[in-house]
Amino acid sequence: MSPAPVQVMGVLNVTDDSFSDGGCYLDLDDAVKHGLAMAAAGAGIVDVGGESSRPGATRVDPAVETSRVIPVVKELAAQGITVSIDTMRADVARAALQNGAQMVNDVSGGRADPAMGPLLAEADVPWVLMHWRAVSADTPHVPVRYGNVVAEVRADLLASVADAVAAGVDPARLVLDPGLGFAKTAQHNWAILHALPELVATGIPVLVGASRKRFLGALLAGPDGVMRPTDGRDTATAVISALAALHGAWGVRVHDVRASVDAIKVVEAWMGAERIERDG
C-alpha cells in the first residue's frame, strides 16, 4: 500500500539562540526569504518560532517573542505560504492566527498555557501537541526516567488529546509529536522512532521532529568522539524522514527541506512501483 503524501514542515527560527540556526533570521527580509525558499523547495508548511526550546535556553519576554514572529508570519501568509506558529503561549498564538497563521505547534503539548486549549477550540485550526513531560520542571531538559518510554509517551500524548478535547478542540484538528530530544536520552529517541507505528496506530496524525538533533550528532561522532556539527546531520535527518514516511507519519519537521522532500519522494516512488507491479 502506498503511503499517504507526507507533509514537510520547514523550520524558521526567528531567534538569537536556537541550536542550529540561532541569529540567522532575525532580520525580517532574511526570514521571509528563507521561508519562501523552503516553500519553493517543497515545504508544505513553514513553522515560525520566536523562542528557542533548546537545552539551556532562557525564556524570552512574550512581547519580544511576538515582535519577532508576527511580521514574518504576516508577510509569508500574504504571499500564500501555509504558516504554523511555534509557541507555547496562547497570546502569541492568537496574534499569529490573526495575522495569517493557519496552525499552532505547541512544544508543551498544551501544558504551558491553560488558555491555549480554549483559544484553539474557538480558532478551529490544527494543533500539534508535542510530548515534553518535564516542561514545567525546574530542569526541563534533564532526561526523565521511564519504565517503558514508548508506552508512557503514548499514554501522555493521549492524555493531552483528552485535555484538548475537554477544552472543546475538535479531535480531527490534533497532531501528535513524540518530542524527540525533549528530556529524553538517545536511547529513548531511538526506541520511540522504532515504535513509530504504535503512535500512528492511534489514528491521530504524527509529526516527527528529529532534524539535526543531538542524538544524531552523537550517532555520527567521529573516531575521536567529537559530535558531528549540526550542519552535518542533514543526511541522517533525511533518512529518518524517509523511514517516518514509510511507517505512516503525517509529517516531518526539518531544517533542510530539499533533502527530506527528495528522500520522501524516493519512498513514495518505491511504494508506488510496488503497487503498480501488483495491480498490473
From Swiss-Prot:
GO BP term, pick one: folic acid biosynthetic process
Notes on how activity is controlled: Is potently inhibited by the sulfone dapsone and the two sulfonamides sulfamethoxazole and sulfamethoxypyridazine, with Kis in the range of 12 to 32 nM. Is only poorly inhibited by p-aminosalicylate (PAS). The inhibition of DHPS by sulfathiazole antagonizes PAS-mediated growth inhibition and therefore confers resistance to PAS.
Cofactor note: Magnesium is required for activity, even if it seems to interact primarily with the substrate.
Domain of life: Bacteria
Catalytic reaction(s) noted: (7,8-dihydropterin-6-yl)methyl diphosphate + 4-aminobenzoate = 7,8-dihydropteroate + diphosphate; 4-aminosalicylate + (7,8-dihydropterin-6-yl)methyl diphosphate = 2-hydroxy-7,8-dihydropteroate + diphosphate
SUPFAM superfamilies: Dihydropteroate synthetase-like
NCBIfam families: DHPS
UniProt name for this protein: Dihydropteroate synthase
GN (gene name): folP1
